[in-house]
Amino acid sequence: MMINPLIFGPLLCLVGVTDVGMAKIGDRLPSLQSIDVSHCRKLSDKGLKAVLLGCQHLRQLVIAGCRLITDNLLIALSKSCIHLEDLVAAGCNNITNAGISGLADGCHKMKSLDMSKCNKVGDPGVCKFAEVSSSSLVSLKLLDCNKVGDKSIHALAKFCHNLETLVIGGCRDVTDASIEALAFACCSRLKCLRMDWCLKITDSSLRSLLSNCKLLVAIDVGCCDQITDAAFQDMDANGFQSALRLLKISSCVRITVAGVRNVIESCMALEHLDVRSCPQVTRQSCEQAGLQFPGSCKVNFEGSLSESDPSVDIFF
């Protein structure tokens, strides 16, 4: 197997590769800065280590869906690839707090980490990672990491003031206390926050976010059934106009047309509004109330909550 590093340059993207294939690549590509082996389900720590040992300039590693990957790979990364900035390990559910902590020991310049659906990752690992990454961390995705709670969010608020994107959908132990702390600490940077299915979140969190985070462009509180119209009251106080472009409030059963009116009057830049499965907010009820949505705003009244919209997904 002959591989010319001039062909691949700084980027290597492989499909269906195994440990044997990675071993043949070995250390022949020392200039690699980005490796994408997502969903290579036969690839394990052993195969990737063979390449990583020679990639001291690696900046990005995408291993999403590589289910055989364990903590050992993250520990190897911390020793061999200290310039790593972006790790996508979504769905690698053999990774635990030990792996995240090990990564933090050596990789101190991390800008982006995606551990979505890694259900063995919880507060101890996230807190350690937040403290070490501190001001460099811009994006953290922890979708359906159900062991993540307030301790993690408080750590982010304490150390990661440059955080722009946070995904904690499905982290059901997160409460208002930590979200409000985050809203104050990251108010000058936070742009995108996904916290659907965070069932302990109330109006208090949303009010704090909307009033403090002036750059907030996307927020998802779908299925947070304690959210009411009160979350959107006084949004236009002191003439403030929200920069919000995306609001997902699907299955927020207490929201009414009055709440939606407050949103559209204060969010003139709104491009996407998701009100699916909101029984009090229908196309008919909005028309009867005479609501005038911004001309560029797409309102989603119907459809399955499992449906994905690429124009919305880009925010998270």
What are these regions (language model features)?
Residues 4, 12, 19, 27, ...:
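C-terminal capping region of solenoid repeat domains
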Residues 1-35, 41-44, 49-52, 70, ...:
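N-terminal adaptor-interaction module of cullin-RING ubiquitin ligase components
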